[in-house]
Amino acid sequence: MILAMLALASATQAQDMSKDVMVQAEIDKVFNAVYNNPDEPGAAVLIMQGDDVIYSRCFGLADMVTKERVTFATNFCIASVSKQFSAVALMQLAEQGVLSLNDPLSKFFPEFQAPFFKDITLHHIMSHTSGIPDARPRDDRNFVLYSNDVSSVQYMRTLDHLNFMPGTQYEYINPTFQLIYQIVERATGIPFETYMQENVFDKAGMKTCRYFEPDRDIAHLAHGYVRDDDGLWKEYDYGEESFFGTKADGALYCSINDFVSWERALRDNRVWTAASKRLAYNPWIQIQPDAEYGYQPGTGYGYGFFVQDLPQHPTRVYHLGDNGGFTIYAGKIPERDLIFLFFSTRPDIDRLGIVNKVYSILNL
C-alpha cells in the first residue's frame, strides 16, 4: 500500500515537472520570436508565483557599445512605471497625517493663479482625473530634452482652463505626477530623492535603483535603442528623447532584482498599509476606448497602477513604461501572488500582445 502511494506521488510529481517544462517551452517560443539575435538590444523577463520561478530569461544586449549583456542586475529606465513609487510616497504621508489625499493643489502651489486649483486634489492627480492639460512647450527641443520636475510644470502658474471637470474623466498626463516631486518636498522639507531613498527604496530593500541624472553613475546601466532608416540600431535615450530628467513621473532606473524586492514590499505592506494598497489598486476611473494612452478592455486607473478586470479572469494590476527605446511591463495578479516583469531595451514589439499570449499559456 505504501509503495503504491509513493509510486502515485512520484508519478504526479513527474507530471507536474513535465507540465512546467512545457509551459516554459511555450513561453520561450513567444519571446524567442522577438529576441532571436543575441547581439541586438534585448530584454529581461521574470514570472514568479510566490517564491517559485515560473519563467526567467534574459535576452540580448544592454549596451551595444560595451557589449554588456542583459541580466537581472541590469538597470533599465522603467519610465512611467516610476509613477507608482511617487504615489506610494504620497500615501505614506497621508498615513502619517502630513497631508490628505483630498488636499487641493492650491495648498501646495499658492503660485498657481487659477481658482480651479482649489478643486483639484491629490486624488485627482494620482488617478489621472485632474482635467489639467499637458501644455508643456514641446516645440522647444532644448526644453523637452533637459527639463526637470520643476521647470516642466511652470506652465500651470498661468494655466487658465481645464480639459474637463476634475474627477469626471480620465486623461493620462505626466506633468501632474511631476507635481509630486514638489509636493513631497514642500510637505516634508526633505529633498525628493532623499525622501524616496530613505522611506521607499531602503524600506523595500532595493539596492541599486537610482533616478537618472546626466552625470550620475548607475551600475549596469542599459541603453534604449531604435532602428534607423537603414535598419541599424542606434541609441535612443537621454539626449535623443524627451523628459529623461523628470523624476516623479518617469526617471527611475531599476533592475529586475530590485523590482522583485519592490513587489514583495508592496505585497507585505512594508512601504504602506493594507488600506493604502486597497486605494492604489482600486480602479477610480474606467478608461474609455478613445483615450490616447492606456486603454485596454475592462481597464481602469488606480493610484499609479492600471487595474484590469475581465470576466472569468483574475484582476491584473500593472503599469507600462515607454521612454526612448525602453519598453516596460510591470504586472501582477495579487490574488495569485504572481508577478510578471518584462523589461526591454527596444520598442519595436507588441508588448501587450506578448503579455496576453503569456497569460493565456498560464491560463490566466
Which residue stretches match the model-derived regions?
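Short, well-ordered beta-strand elements
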Residues: 316-319, 328-332, 336-346
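A short acidic/small-residue loop/turn micro-motif
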Residues: 60-64, 243, 347-349
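Short, gly/Ser/Thr-rich active-site loops of penicillin-recognizing serine hydrolases
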Residues: 285-290, 343-364
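Short, conserved catalytic-motif segment at the N-terminal edge
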Residues: 19-76, 100
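Short, glycine/proline-biased beta-turn/loop segments that scaffold the active-site neighborhood
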Residues: 100-115
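Short, surface-exposed loop or secondary-structure junction motifs
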Residues: 63, 117-320
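Bacterial Sec-dependent N-terminal signal peptides
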Residues: 1-18
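Active-site SXXK
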Residues: 31, 45, 51, 75-102, ...
